[in-house]
Regions:
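Metal-dependent nucleotidyltransferase catalytic core
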Residues: 2-27, 38-40, 46, 53-102, ...
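A contiguous, low-structure linker/loop signature
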Residues: 96-126
Length: 275
C-alpha cells in the first residue's frame, strides 16, 4: 500500500500498512488518515508518524477500552502512553519509530481537520464532507495564559531569591530555568499571540514557531550552578521579561504588577549587594 504524493521511510511505510490493514479489518473503524508533517510534506528522517482514525459513535467507548490491543497490531511497542490526553496514544517501537495515534468518533471528527491530511481509508465516504479550516484559537484563553506568565514570573523570582538566601543552589537553578521558560513563553506570544505552546512545552518546535535570534540575550543565562553566575543570569532574564511583559500587558489590557515588581527588584538588588 502506498499513500499518493507522500514519501515515507521503510519503517514508517511498514507501520502504515499494518495500521491500514487493522483499520480495514476493524468494523468499529470507519475512516483513517495520515496527518502531521508527513501529510504536510514537511517530514524529515527524524519525524514521527501521525495517524488518525474515526470510529462509529456506538463503538467509540469500546475502542477506547481496547485501544492498546489495537495499537499492538502495528507491532510491539516498547513505550505506550497517553499522558492524560483522552484521544491519543504515543508509541515507540523497537526500531525507534515514534507513532502517534489520534482517535475520535464520527460525530466529533469534524473539528479536527485544521491542517493538511491524506485519506487512507474511508468506508462511508465521510471525508468528502470534510472542509479544511484554520483552527480557531480562543483569544480569551491566550489572554489568561499571558496574565499567568506575567504574574507567575514574580512568584518564581521570589523562590529564586529565597533559594539563594538559604544557599540552596539546586533549588535556585530550578527556579532560574522556570524564569527563563516564562520569558520564552512571552517571546512566543509577542511573536504570535495565537501560539498555544507557551506554558507546558514552551520550547516545543520553537525554531519553527518564531525567529529564535530574538532569544539571543537569554543564551548567556545557561550558566554554571554558582551563586554569582546565577545572579547575573537572573538580572538578564529580568530585563528580558520587562521588555516583553510590559508591552504585551498594555496591548491586551492586563494590569501590570508595578508594586510587585518594585518589591521583588529590591529583594534581588539586596541579595546581589550581599554577595
Amino acid at each position: 500500500m502506498a499513500v499518493p504524493d507522500v514519501q515515507l521511510s521503510r519503517r514508517h511505510q511498514n507501520i502504515l500498512e499494518r495500521f491500514l490493514s487493522a483499520c480495514q479489518a476493524d468494523e468499529r473503524v470507519v475512516a483513517s488518515f495520515l496527518i502531521g508533517s508527513n501529510a504536510k510534506g514537511k517530514a524529515d528522517e527524524h519525524s514521527d508518524l501521525d495517524l488518525y482514525l474515526v470510529t462509529t459513535d456506538a463503538a467509540f467507548d469500546d475502542f477506547v477500552a481496547t485501544r492498546e490491543s489495537f495499537a499492538r497490531l502495528l507491532g510491539e511497542p516498547l513505550f505506550m502512553e497517553d499522558f492524560g490526553h483522552p484521544n491519543i496514544l504515543f508509541l515507540i517501537f523497537a526500531d525507534g519509530s515514534e507513532v502517534e495515534i489520534y482517535y475520535t468518533s464520527e460525530s466529533q471528527s469534524g473539528g479536527f481537520f485544521n491542517a493538511p491530511y491524506k485519506v487512507l481509508m474511508d468506508k462511508k465516504h465521510s471525508s468528502e464532507k470534510i472542509a479544511l479550516s484554520e483552527s480557531d484559537v480562543d483569544q480569551a484563553q491566550q489572554t489568561e495564559k499571558l496574565r499567568r506568565l506575567i504574574h507567575w514570573f514574580w512568584h518564581n523570582l521570589s523562590h529564586f531569591i529565597t533559594a539563594l538566601e538559604r544557599d540552596q543552589l539546586w533549588w535556585a537553578r530550578g527556579q532560574l530555568e522556570e524564569l527563563r521558560a516564562g520569558c520564552v513563553g512571552l517571546a512566543r506570544l509577542s511573536n504570535n499571540f495565537s501560539d498555544t505552546e507557551v506554558e507546558e512545552e514552551v520550547y516545543f518546535k520553537i525554531e519553527d514557531a518564531m525567529p529564535v535570534d530574538s532569544l539571543a540575550p537569554l543564551r548567556e543565562t545557561f550558566c554554571p550552578m554558582e551563586r554569582e553566575a546565577m545572579l547575573e543570569a537572573a538580572s538578564v532574564i529580568l530585563n528580558s521579561y520587562k521588555e516583553l511583559a510590559r508591552p504585551l500587558a498594555q496591548a491586551h489590557e492586563i494590569a501590570y504588577p508595578e508594586k510587585l515588581e518594585q518589591i521583588m527588584v529590591e529583594r534581588l538588588e539586596k541579595i546581589s549587594e550581599d554577595r
